[in-house]
Amino acid sequence: MEAPAITHSSGCVCSDCQWSGSPTVDTKVYLGSGTHANTTKTRETSFLSVLNDNAWLFVIAALILCLYFIISKPHVDAVYTEFHQDLNGFSMKLAPGVPIDPKVIAAVKNWQKYPFGTDPRENMVTSIVSGLRHSFCILLLVVVLLVYVCHKP
């Protein structure tokens, strides 16, 4: 009859284990007649051991996310054209050396078309598509990282 394998806990301080402080499990395997014993050390699976093994992967993922948010940040020019418009008049301040911005002309024409504000349906599709695009990019990044971690040899 074969003797069962003895599993020691990670805190075991018996003479066979001499626990060194690292989370390991000693497994004794008795082969055949039980005269020969092989001792193997296997690492316990815990959240901290997985985090320690893949710490560089989490750091890379965090850097990629930071880079993504920095790149997707809107660019603001320091030189701009300012205009003010109400029902009684229109005023425009131009920055020195800057021609009239076509966006200002488009805004004036838009005001003439919608004097009480823009049509809310005008930019709805654009904002939805933009939000979905950013969400899809983050979802794709998460899926790629999960596939890499799960299928890591």
Curated annotation (Swiss-Prot):
Protein function: Participates in the transport of viral genome to neighboring plant cells directly through plasmodesmata, without any budding. TGBp2 and TGBp3 are necessary for intracellular delivery of TGBp1-containing vRNPs to plasmodesmata. Can gate plasmodesmata and increase their size exclusion limit. Induces host actin cytoskeleton network thickening, which probably plays a major role in virus cell-to-cell movement.
TM spans (from-to): 51-71, 128-148
Membrane topology annotation: Multi-pass membrane protein
This protein's GO CC annotations: host cell endoplasmic reticulum membrane; host cell plasmodesma; host cytoskeleton; membrane
Domain notes: The 2nd transmembrane domain is involved in plasmodesmata targeting.
Primary site of residence: host cell
Source organism of the structure: Peanut clump virus (isolate 87/TGTA2)
The name this protein goes by in its record: Movement protein TGB3
Lumenal side, ranges: 72-127
Self-association state and partner proteins as the record states: Interacts with movement proteins TGB1 and TGB2. TGB1-TGB3-TGB2 complex formation is enhanced by ATP hydrolysis.
UniProt keywords, alphabetically: Host cell junction, Host cytoplasm, Host cytoskeleton, Host endoplasmic reticulum, Host membrane, Membrane, Phosphoprotein, Transmembrane, Transmembrane helix, Transport, Viral movement protein
Family per record: Belongs to the virgaviridae TGB3 movement protein family.
Localization (cell): Host cell junction, Host plasmodesma; Host endoplasmic reticulum membrane; Host cytoplasm, Host cytoskeleton
GO biological process terms on file: transport of virus in host, cell to cell
Pfam families (alphabetical): Viral_Beta_CD
Cytoplasmic side: 1-50, 149-153
